[in-house]
């Protein structure tokens, strides 16, 4: 009887275990686990005491050894790890709530080289990130994270690109440099296509040729002039009507994506709120660290909101204070109007600021066009801005990247005034530091370095700079505030790592991935030299030379950047358009 009772008890234990188990895991699991036992997870075809008693309520079904081996066997991971020495360091942790394993892989100086998720139920690798994708979520190919899903769709992007090309091409001279210039501008779209697929080692190099070409082309125009003036192939009213339609379309797309604000626009709202509360933005961004959590969990199940020093529950953006003061002051009117809840929500103030400065660029280009070429040029410039897909890309991301070009375009409109030029360069430079490189060029326009003009330019630059930097006076100590400002802005920008240009790929220490740090250093020195040369050559400059050389300096800055983004294309676009469309002898 005892034997029958034991057998019955054993059956009651084994049958539910076998019946509740999932199908067998993939056959690619390694043959042995750390204990030397068979490692195939318990399934319907598996009948053993080990399978019956291995699952613990709330515990994992798979062993760490099995999970790591499955992850390393993933083709994408295996291909990347082939670039490193064998036997990397690994770790796998199990999350009871999600029933998933997080696997991490390290290799020597390269640090963490792979990251992923493995489902405990069936051993499936649900996420696998390698190289740049480990530290940078924006490198993982999430279409629509920037610019929105509609704009990034091929059936919107390609027609918009075609409208830009057809609208500005000179049909009388199709086979010309002018046509090539327009095609090169649009070629950034090829790089973006790979970026949206998470292929950073293809997308980043593909952005270099158009930047380099446009740099050489605009520098040539600035130093040597242009052979002919391109002619518009369409009636002015047609371009104006299309421009108005596209302008309305981009605003509509922006408003239809209420949560399409990336961290850049969010930072502007936070900074403006801090200023209105009597604090400088620097060193006062919302952080996570060990502060008490508050708010709801995000898509990954993590709670990112924290109770900050001001007692509010705010969404973290710890590195949001890396921009110049003007990048935050520009958001003050919208924050005063719409306020801020403390959360990374719809952020209407960010939408309003992005749309507002986009409209200021368009209006500024119209004014510049009317001054230097009449209504046809005004319409062509406005059309070029609204039809170019990457300007919509920036405004739909609700960034601060239209602020700098808006200020510079209006400064260009008043270029005959040294006070206006000095003010514009200062305000633009304290938004994005790239604009400070334009100071020598704009100082010496139009007839070289002249004492009276230089004094007026310098005085305006100084007054505007002091007015913007006055936000540092909101801190208890001006010295400490200035030190924090330099550390959080220039200090961070000069030391940051990034995979979004080829120059910093040496950080991965991967076989076949070049270390181009020396090339970047040469480029940076060359750009600084260019910023000085254009101040002296040519000695006499007209509007065409000023526009083209401004574009060349900004392009050089972007070409040498460690962290480059498609959002930066609007910085130089107005001056590229002016260089291509302004009359040769504009006055």
Regions found by a protein language model. Name each.
Residues 7-17:
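Bacterial N-terminal signal peptides
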Residues 184-191, 195-235, 246, 250-412, ...:
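Primarily membrane-embedded glycan-assembly and transfer machineries that use lipid-linked glycans
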Residues 166-175, 372-373, 401, 408-420:
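Membrane-interface transmembrane helices that cradle and orient dolichyl/undecaprenyl
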Residues 10, 20-21, 137-239, 246:
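Membrane-embedded, hydrophobic transmembrane alpha-helices
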Residues 52-94, 150-153:
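Short, non-transmembrane alpha-helical segments in secretory-pathway proteins
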